[in-house]
Amino acid sequence: MLKGGMLSRWKMWSPQYKILRNHLINFKSVSTYKNISGVNTKQPKSPRQFGCMPHVTKKRKYKYEEGKTYHGFQCERVEHISEFELTSYTFRYERTGTELWHIDRNDSNNVFSINFRTTPFDSTGLPHILEHLSLCGSQKYPVRDPFFKMLNRSVATFMNAMTGPDYTIYPFSTMNEIDFRNLQHIYLDAVFRPNLAYFDFLQEGWRLENKDIFDKQSKLVIKGVVYNEMKGAFSENAQVFSQNLLNNIFPDHTYRHVSGGNPLEIPKLAYNDLVEFHKKYYHPSNARIYSYGLFDASKTLALLDEEYLSDQSWVDNSYSLIRQQERWTQPRLVHISSRLDNMGTTIDRQNQIAIALLMCDATNIQESFELHVLSEVLIRGPNSPFYKNLIEPNFSGGYNQTTGYSSDTKDTTFVVGLQDLRVEDFKKCIEIFDKTIINSMNDGFDSQHVESVLHNLELSLKHQNPNFGNTLLFNSTALWNHDGDVVSNLRVSDMISGLRESISQNKKYFQEKIEKYFANNNHRLTLTMSPDEAYEDKFKQAELELVEQKVKLLDEVKIEKIYERGLILDSYQKAESNTDLLPCLTMNDVRDPPKWPKLFIQNVQNVRTQICKVPTNEITYFKCMFNITGLSHEETQLMPLFCNVISAMGTTNYNYREFDKHILLKTGGFDFKLHLIEDVRDSKSYSLSVMINTHALNNNVPEMFALCQELIKNVRFDDSERLKMLIENYISYISVGVASSGHLYAMLGATSQVCDAGKLKSLLYGVDHIDFMKNFVHSTSTVDICDKLSTIASKVFNKDNMRGAINTTQSYEPSAISNYEKFLESLPTFGKTQTSRNIHYLDPSCQQYVMNIPVNYCAKALFTVPYLHQDHPTLRVLAKLLSAKYLLPVIREKNGAYGAGAKISSDGIFSFYSYRDPNSTKTLNAFDETYKWLRANQNVIDQQSLFESKLGVLQQLDTPIAPGNIGIDYFLYEVSQEDFESYRSRMLSVTIDDLQCAIENYFGKESMHYGKCILGPVNANLELETSHKWIINN
């Protein structure tokens, strides 16, 4: 999600993308909810009734004491969790039973969230649309879309709202306390006292409206932000598969419905049903409130008591409880259809299969943790049974995104899924799955493989995340939603110790779990999916019939009312809001830049090395970058593949299984990334580099460097069968999910029309890379590819073209440098090669990547000035202003796209984009009319909108950075802390006159170097509607 471009994330059920890191059942929307005002006479439950008696704690000084009451909140439980250096406080509001979980931790990035258990009873998307409407104005802030308006009145590090399968959460985070209190007021008023205006329902949910609202004779169509969002979501096959897996393995309760909304069911939602749902499910007794960080929790308790909870009474919220799924007596098989993906593999291989098993109750914390570890042992890496038996035989494109263990639902699940396989291989997959389970149950696992999984988990506990508070919230939400013990769930070290103890006492511990949960489990779903070439046509026909059914019920009076309502909505959307009602920071609140540790530059064995001494929790982080600009064009195009497979091929001294085992036992893994970096001073040249990123516990640093040395000196590309499998999995991986990131691909496609560096970026990261890889593999033998990758490896790791960076603690720094020196001693040196290439700018052009999906992703890119040019911060402020004042109101609110915005990158490319957009040429026209709008609406650029736009930029500039990544901008771009502070100061000093000058200089006349790009369905009238020639990529 691009902050400021999209309102919410509807969380699709997908175990592999669980946040630790995200069908046509016809049920009438319930409209007979009981009014809660009649049941307020019951007394709040006691702590015993809630199953949470005061917890006995050790003698430690705490800010709040168990059993005491603070602003109406009784403190029920206090615990210190040493592994995360935090103290957990559990409060419960005595009048309503509302639980508040406060995490006190020395972390400047503070978090707040209001969570509700929202169980859908149909697929109209009611909880999802309510989430949107709640943020469209409230009693205290009767401003249309205060959420979007606060994006630029805040320096939040995160602001969003999310609808999951059975919950809705409203989280934000910020490092500024004034900002924190402002956003608390906005969010609390939004959820407890929203306006829920009917016209916001029409805008955000769905409406029947004339295609051209000013033409009474134009046909009636369905519009709406969520409606278009979900059309986009259901155009992605991976999402369709994940959603159907959830619906079919839990067929008896709320999970059988689509919480985000099925596009063909959304138009069945009535506005009154949504209002009634809010009264019941957003009651404080059904809420859970989370706060995290350094800020005073007593202020939060007082605010809740005085303004939102004291006039409420307890209600029994058992109506929202999710019961366990009744277990099946026989396994089930379900087959579904999907769209033909023209960017995917051949039609005969565009099939997917998943075998899913229902596991344990999510609230059984130790059991769920152990099943999670067991799942990793079964599927993770080349030493796991399923990888060996399902992936290495190479009859598929590898695991699909549903693979893994998930605790996102009341009952946890384990899934193994494959993508890009033939229908005739479904049977083979099932047979291999069964055989793998039986063999694992009988033979057990290699102890080192199990230990490598546990080590990786332990290392992740030490790894510091700048968004720890948000991560903790997202990891805990599902468990908390089912009344699980979220505090005990933080004691991961205890759970690991408990598991190790169980394994040591019973050598068949995991084997017995496999017998119980895998071999003898009848609650097993096999879901298969195959493409239907008529899938999109069938959806369009169903949508057309839905509209026709609704139109048949209309007489002339109702049709006239729809026309008039469309005009009223248009006026409603254009009306000016009194944003003075909203809180806003001042310049004094944000003037000081964040302080970062000093970077030291040393020449270590003739290698420029950046050193940062910083508290890293006993971890050393190492990055090294090799300039590869001198590679040939073909070799450069193969670098993304090279980066993907190099650590999976094995070395001279270790086969790939042994090497993977050593990596996981001693390090956090080796990540290879290709970087194309333009000169941020003048954008006249660029360089190409490959960066290796790894980290390890301090006591494993010698082994980390030894393994890195082994890999880059002795990697082998002689196993053609393994490489063939890795290549096919890689192509399958990059081909999946294009639509879900369609705006990013569209911006890359537009940039590729601006300059040759942009064209190369698209060939390395964009849709063009997918096409290149397919064609290259088709025309080149695997043996030849082995030879080409070996040649690349012999050229890339040149000590003369290397730079290094080490982030570690001050006390360990001498040891880290000593081990680093030994690592450098063995690296080959064969002279400096070409280190940069000149950038050439291109004539304007337009291109479309045709996709058989029902929405568009549009982009326009033009060259302006790079990061260190004096006008760059002005253009960055302008991009924020355009997003908030022009693009979002026109493209999102009025025209129905899910998201839209503008941005400028460090290379000086200024981009416009839209996301899940029902329009294409209409949106491109809006991009083109930017200058016209700016000149016609000069009054919009006032001191307040200027300051708000600066705050939007500060959200990005002042974002928290993990200890392991401090100094990354200098390492990649040679942007120093002094450069950064100068840039930040210039940005804050931008005036209205500066903006006006930038508007004239960069938008007053059409840029000499621009490009346009659309990802979306065929448009036969594209050239006619745009008056441009288009390159069409089918």
Curated annotation (Swiss-Prot):
One Pfam family this sequence matches: PreP_C
Matches recorded under InterPro entries: Metalloenz_LuxS/M16, Peptidase_M16_C, Peptidase_M16C_assoc, PreP_C
GO molecular function: metal ion binding; metalloendopeptidase activity
Transit peptide: 1-29
Cellular compartments annotated: Mitochondrion
Alphabetical UniProt keywords: Hydrolase, Metal-binding, Metalloprotease, Mitochondrion, Protease, Transit peptide, Zinc
Enzyme Commission number(s) from the entry: 3.4.24.-
Co-factor(s): Zn(2+)
Domain of life assignment: Eukaryota
Residues annotated as the enzyme's active site: E131
Biological processes per GO annotation: protein processing; proteolysis
An annotated GO cellular component: mitochondrial matrix
Cofactor annotation comment: Binds 1 zinc ion per subunit.
Residue numbers binding Zn(2+): H128, H132, E229
Major place of residence: mitochondrion
Assembly description: Homodimer.
Function: ATP-independent protease that degrades mitochondrial transit peptides after their cleavage. Also degrades other unstructured peptides.
Family, as annotated: Belongs to the peptidase M16 family. PreP subfamily.
Protein name: Presequence protease, mitochondrial
Organism expressing this protein natively: Drosophila melanogaster
